[in-house]
Curated annotation (Swiss-Prot):
Belongs to the HAM1 NTPase family. Binds 1 Mg(2+) ion per subunit. Signal peptide: none annotated. It comes from Deinococcus radiodurans (strain ATCC 13939 / DSM 20539 / JCM 16871 / CCUG 27074 / LMG 4051 / NBRC 15346 / NCIMB 9279 / VKM B-1422 / R1). It catalyses: XTP + H2O = XMP + diphosphate + H(+); dITP + H2O = dIMP + diphosphate + H(+); ITP + H2O = IMP + diphosphate + H(+). This is dITP/XTP pyrophosphatase. GO terms for cellular component: cytoplasm; cytosol. Pyrophosphatase that catalyzes the hydrolysis of nucleoside triphosphates to their monophosphate derivatives, with a high preference for the non-canonical purine nucleotides XTP (xanthosine triphosphate), dITP (deoxyinosine triphosphate) and ITP. Seems to function as a house-cleaning enzyme that removes non-canonical purine nucleotides from the nucleotide pool, thus preventing their incorporation into DNA/RNA and avoiding chromosomal lesions. InterPro entries: dITP/XTP_pyrophosphatase, ITPase-like_fam, RdgB/HAM1. Mg(2+) binds at E49, D78. It is an enzyme of class 3 (hydrolase). Disulfide bonds: none annotated.
Amino acid sequence: MQQQTGGRRRQIRRVVVATSNAGKVRELQGALAPLGWQCEGLGAVTLPEETGSTYEENAALKACAAAMATGLPALADDSGIEVLALGGQPGVYSARFGNVNSDVERNVLLLEKMRRHTDRRAKFVSVLVLAYPDGKLEEYRGEVTGQLLEGPRGESGFGYDPLFLPDGSELSMGEMTLEQKQAISHRGQALAALLAAHGA
């Protein structure tokens, strides 16, 4: 697999969004509208298990599998929250943290692990990989720093959003509208880089 870093970008009309996470699908579909790309779901495609040790590896695994299975360009995201006091955990394991099944349970577990820590600095990281059926890859990364709250705030977003207060914001990511979130979020930054690279 190669990473496409420069030169003219390819013309894309249809792209597969390689995720089963409905929250991510909503964010990506709306953000890609300026490109005029027709976004398609996975259909019957089964994504491989995330076995990579980095966000880049996990996103590439999913994007490449979807591109090869469909014959279309595929866009995948891998993201996570890294908490300084926990040595960067849960990181790439954010979606599988504690082997529990729901966002609420993962949030409760993270808060429990933070109970004795006063340093609540954290950051969200997102890596988008756009894979083509011929194996070429494009990577885009975004990060946002902030603080882990002592309890959830807001019911918007998904994942760890209700626990995360971005630096300079009075709203948690769980209290923001989708538009507010995309303007500052890790995924919003990665998407902005993709849009710029493709001329939007």
